[in-house]
């Protein structure tokens, strides 16, 4: 194992968003490629908004995508003593100070700066020490350098520089004694030995402040890679109005995890013109430097196309297992009907999602369906009844009820009767499926099995009268 250490650090204030999932995936892929360590950290310092339900949703989403972690999950809420120790260290070394300025005074200074056309930032009233009564509330600020430039080479964006005189003296501990995000993230990354930080580009402006904290604490500064955000089709930030944004919502909509992984990694990263990647190929070929600088646009049609590909390529036995909850949602107990694996085989080519597959499978398990009125009027006609009855008799005598034998029987049957398949096929399809849209009739007959096929054909004959 190498010294490369990466982390995914979500806040448990909601579900695992597709943007967060992509960030987790990039970190996971790089850790696997470099034979490093992938750490999961839950940033739950916002106790009021953090929920166990959200933690569970994040862990569930990670597990569904197959993004296992090597260390963790670590919870920031359990590390407050660690943060307090580092705050006290900075204060003792003169690198942080107590600030007694009230929120009203700070707001007045902010408004004045805006009025005078200056960038609003803390003016350093308490920076060099002030005598205040011990019972007055205070925050603790980091004493940031006001001269020079903070520069870092972003692995995606390139060189980025900030003038230090534009940076505030960052609050690192609130008046209630709790640490702030920008402080705890540095302490965690430093003490956990994180070597590369891959995160959303909405964190770029936090980076110079965090670099200055690393330097003040005497820790090595990790490499940074800021990933562009994901946009909706209208080029605004992806949100619920664009459709589902939760990873687990896509699972519930019948998407396969490998399709989601393949789609997410291609939202910003590419390897030539290749579209389909196995997990092994992704680990081998992924590089953070190949992630584009511009935002990716979420395209549900592309995700559907990928999902259809993976459904067609997947083993029917695995899909059958995944399909069971979708069937039960529709009130169907698959054990009470034909082999679900055989049913799946008939639907793989035509199903883009497991939801579509489950809907397409219903007729196999409900033999009492009503016939589509138009289809019945057109195909379940008096001339069809003797053909269906004769076909049922032939099928009843068939010993080998495989698709190949069924197809051979049909060819023999239409030759005997001197008819074309089109003169009996649609009537058979409506008899077995209730309508004219279904998988191939030979596949359907094999999946239904002899007993159910005969029952449905004779039911149709009785319907015709």
UniProtKB/Swiss-Prot annotation:
Domain of life of the native organism: Bacteria
Q: One Pfam family, short name please?
A: tRNA-synt_1c
Entry GO terms, CC: cytosol
Molecular-function GO terms, alphabetical: ATP binding; glutamate-tRNA ligase activity; tRNA binding; zinc ion binding
Q: Which Gene Ontology BP terms does the record give? A: glutamyl-tRNA aminoacylation
Entry's localization field: Cytoplasm
Identify the Gene3D superfamilies for this entry. Answer: 1.10.10.350, Glutamate-tRNA synthetase, class I, anticodon-binding domain 1, HUPs
Q: Where is this motif: 'KMSKS' region?
A: 237-241
The record's annotation in CDD domains points to: GluRS_core (cd00808)
Q: Which UniProt keywords apply?
A: Aminoacyl-tRNA synthetase, ATP-binding, Cytoplasm, Ligase, Nucleotide-binding, Protein biosynthesis
Where, by residue number, does ATP bind?
240
Per its UniProt entry, what is the enzyme's top EC class, as one word?
ligase
Q: Where is this motif: 'HIGH' region?
A: 10-20
The family database entries (InterPro entries) matched by this protein are listed as: aa-tRNA-synth_I_cd-bd (IPR045462), aa-tRNA-synth_I_codon-bd_sub2 (IPR020751), aa-tRNA-synth_I_CS (IPR001412), aa_tRNA-synth_I_cd-bd_sf (IPR008925), Glu-tRNA-ligase_bac/mito (IPR004527), Glu-tRNA-synth_I_codon-bd_sub1 (IPR020752), Glu/Gln-tRNA-synth (IPR000924), Glu/Gln-tRNA-synth_Ib_cat-dom (IPR020058)
What Enzyme Commission number(s) does the record list for this chain? Answer: 6.1.1.17
Q: Which catalytic reaction applies to this protein?
A: tRNA(Glu) + L-glutamate + ATP = L-glutamyl-tRNA(Glu) + AMP + diphosphate
Q: Which family does it belong to?
A: Belongs to the class-I aminoacyl-tRNA synthetase family. Glutamate--tRNA ligase type 1 subfamily.
What quaternary structure, including any partners, is listed in this protein's UniProt entry?
Answer: Monomer.
Q: Which purpose does this protein serve, as stated in its record?
A: Catalyzes the attachment of glutamate to tRNA(Glu) in a two-step reaction: glutamate is first activated by ATP to form Glu-AMP and then transferred to the acceptor end of tRNA(Glu).
Please identify the protein, giving its name as recorded.
Glutamate--tRNA ligase
Species assigned in the record:
Geobacter metallireducens (strain ATCC 53774 / DSM 7210 / GS-15)
Gene this protein is translated from: gltX
């Amino acid at each position: 194992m190498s010294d490369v250490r990466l982390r995914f650090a979500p806040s448990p204030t909601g579900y695992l968003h597709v943007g967060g999932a992509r960030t987790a995936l990039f970190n996971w892929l790089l850790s696997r490629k470099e034979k490093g360590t992938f750490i999961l950290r839950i940033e739950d310092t916002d106790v009021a908004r953090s929920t166990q339900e959200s933690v569970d949703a994040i862990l569930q989403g990670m597990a569904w995508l197959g993004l296992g972690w090597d260390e963790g999950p670590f919870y920031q809420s359990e590390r407050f003593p660690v943060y307090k120790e580092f705050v006290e260290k900075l204060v003792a070394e003169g690198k942080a100070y107590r600030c007694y300025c009230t929120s009203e005074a700070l707001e007045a200074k902010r408004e004045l700066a805006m009025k005078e056309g200056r960038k609003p930032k803390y003016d350093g009233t308490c920076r060099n020490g002030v005598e205040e009564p011990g019972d007055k509330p205070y925050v603790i600020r980091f004493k940031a350098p006001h001269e020079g430039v903070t520069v870092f080479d972003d692995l995606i964006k390139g060189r980025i520089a900030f003038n230090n005189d534009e940076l505030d003296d960052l609050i690192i501990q609130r008046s209630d004694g709790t640490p702030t995000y920008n402080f705890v993230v540095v302490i965690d990354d430093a003490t956990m030995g994180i070597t590369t930080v891959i995160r959303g580009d909405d964190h770029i402006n936090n980076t110079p402040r965090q670099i200055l904290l690393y330097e003040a604490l005497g820790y090595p500064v990790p490499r940074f890679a800021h990933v562009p955000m994901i946009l909706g089709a209208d080029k605004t930030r992806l949100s619920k109005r664009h459709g589902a944004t939760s990873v687990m919502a896509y699972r519930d909509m019948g998407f396969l995890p490998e399709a989601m992984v393949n789609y997410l990694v291609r939202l910003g990263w590419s390897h030539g013109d290749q579209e389909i990647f196995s997990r092994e190929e992704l680990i081998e070929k992924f590089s953070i430097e190949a992630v584009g600088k511009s935002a990716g646009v979420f395209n549900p049609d592309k995700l559907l196309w990928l999902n259809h590909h993976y459904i067609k390529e997947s083993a029917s036995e695995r899909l059958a297992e995944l399909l069971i909850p979708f069937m039960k949602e529709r009130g169907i107990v698959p054990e009470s009907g034909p082999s679900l694996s055989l049913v799946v085989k008939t639907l793989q080519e035509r199903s883009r999602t497991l939801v579509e597959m489950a809907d397409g499978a219903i007729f196999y398990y409900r033999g009492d369906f009503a016939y589509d009125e138009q289809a019945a009027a057109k195909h379940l006609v008096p001339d069809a009844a003797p053909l269906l009855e004769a076909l049922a008799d032939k099928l009843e005598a068939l010993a080998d009820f495989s698709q190949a034998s069924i197809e051979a029987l049909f060819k023999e049957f239409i030759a005997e009767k001197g008819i074309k398949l089109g003169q009996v096929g649609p009537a058979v399809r409506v008899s077995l499926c209730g309508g004219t849209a279904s998988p191939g009739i030979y596949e359907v007959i094999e999946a239904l099995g002899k007993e159910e096929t005969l029952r449905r054909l004779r039911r149709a004959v009785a319907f015709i009268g």
